[in-house]
């Protein structure tokens, strides 16, 4: 494989939600302490953790791409004795860095696919690209790879996710039409603190601005054009019971069945935050931390995948579609390939998960990974012959 990484496969200006420089420096130092290759740390440090592996078989034939996301969640993994990773010694080494969404299995299957292709390459035509993407959580990483042109030559694009629910166990869904467009925002209100008993009238209460915003954000009218979502997941304010809060921070997200519906939610959000600030004589700032459009699917490609996977006989069901209702920045890859005349789909590998995604007890059935590698390898070789 030819391997490109870091700034070679990222448009650095298109990255979103980067940690602070101090956080990134600390992560690089930790990687070095744990034995990472210094050359790779240099190339991939400071928010450049992206990789594309390419194998070209011939000038004729399609360019086929598979994407695997790599990042963990800010979840503290369970130490319970009934949690298999804890019981068998492979629980997360670092706190608040748990693979609670299965992206470690996506990497594993991506590497398994790489080996599968390397051992089945005789007679293949065209080119395969294996895309390992950072920062799917918070939908922050895919756009930078797309803007770097990573999929501009791709004819067939495939994404996949493992897990979801018990009903999907040992199933392979060939498309997901349930992607919601989403935007992740941080809103900070700035006021003026004073003594809560001695001079409350001199205060500009940022906490009250935040409270006003939260209540009214949750009350945004729904859109007739389709599903919409609003969630304020974090609200931080205050330093003491007798001090009027001068800063309040909200971390929130909007979602919409279409990009247009999500845009409506964003505009209403901005109006409400501005109004809440004005009501309480505060200033405010809004920072975008992540965003993805609604994803599009090539139904004809999904039908073809269904006809390829069903004869394998390794899944109890191979449904055409599973609509999960979440958001995924793989949509950037799918949409770019379709916009440029190619075809794309996003598949779901069902697994009997032990707890919901993003839960401290999340775990998958590892046998499903093996079936996933076979499925991906079969799809790849079908289109590369």
What is the role of each PLM region?
Residues 40-45, 136, 175-179, 321-325:
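Short Gly/Pro-enriched turn/cap motifs at secondary-structure boundaries
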Residues 44, 97-104, 322-323:
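Active-site nucleophile and cofactor-binding loops and adjacent substrate-binding regions
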Residues 51, 73-74, 84-87, 91-98, ...:
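Histidine/acidic-residue-rich, glycine-tolerant segments that coordinate divalent metal ions
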Residues 107-113:
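DPxDG-like acidic metal-binding loop motif
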Residues 207-385:
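Metal-dependent amide/peptide-bond hydrolase catalytic core
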């Amino acid at each position: 494989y030819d391997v490109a990484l870091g700034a070679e496969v990222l448009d650095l200006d298109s990255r979103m939600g980067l940690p602070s420089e101090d956080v990134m420096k600390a992560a690089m130092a930790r990687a070095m302490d744990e034995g990472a290759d210094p050359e790779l740390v240099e190339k991939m440090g400071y928010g450049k953790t992206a990789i594309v592996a390419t194998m070209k078989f011939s000038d004729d034939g399609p360019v086929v791409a598979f994407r695997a996301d790599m990042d963990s969640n800010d979840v503290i993994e369970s130490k319970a004795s009934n949690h298999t990773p804890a019981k068998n010694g492979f629980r997360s080494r670092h706190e608040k860095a748990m693979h609670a969404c299965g992206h470690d299995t996506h990497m594993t299957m991506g590497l398994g696919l790489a080996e599968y292709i390397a051992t089945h390459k005789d007679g293949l035509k065209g080119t395969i690209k294996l895309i390992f993407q950072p920062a799917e959580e918070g939908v922050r990483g895919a756009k930078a790879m797309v803007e770097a042109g990573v999929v501009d030559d791709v004819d067939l694009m495939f994404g996949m996710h493992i897990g979801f629910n018990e009903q999907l166990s040992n199933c392979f869904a060939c498309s997901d039409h349930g992607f919601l467009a989403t935007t992740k925002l941080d809103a900070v209100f700035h006021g003026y603190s004073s003594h809560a008993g001695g001079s409350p009238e001199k205060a500009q209460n940022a906490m009250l601005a935040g409270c006003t915003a939260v209540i009214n954000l949750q009350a945004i009218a729904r859109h007739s054009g389709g599903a919409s979502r609003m969630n304020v997941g974090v609200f931080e304010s205050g330093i003491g019971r007798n001090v009027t809060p001068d800063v309040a921070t909200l971390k929130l997200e909007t979602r919409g069945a279409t990009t247009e519906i999500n845009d409506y939610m964003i505009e209403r959000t901005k109006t409400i935050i501005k109004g809440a600030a004005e009501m309480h004589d505060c200033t405010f700032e809004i920072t975008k931390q992540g965003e993805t459009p609604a994803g599009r699917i090539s139904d004809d490609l999904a039908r073809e995948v269904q006809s390829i996977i069903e004869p394998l006989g390794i899944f109890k069901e191979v449904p055409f579609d599973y609509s999960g209702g979440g958001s995924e920045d793989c949509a950037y890859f799918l949409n770019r390939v379709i916009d440029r005349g190619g075809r794309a789909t996003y598949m779901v590998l069902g697994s009997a998960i032990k707890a919901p995604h993003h839960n401290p007890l999340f775990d998958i059935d590892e046998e499903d990974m093996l079936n996933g590698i076979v499925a991906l390898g079969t799809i790849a070789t079908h289109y590369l012959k």
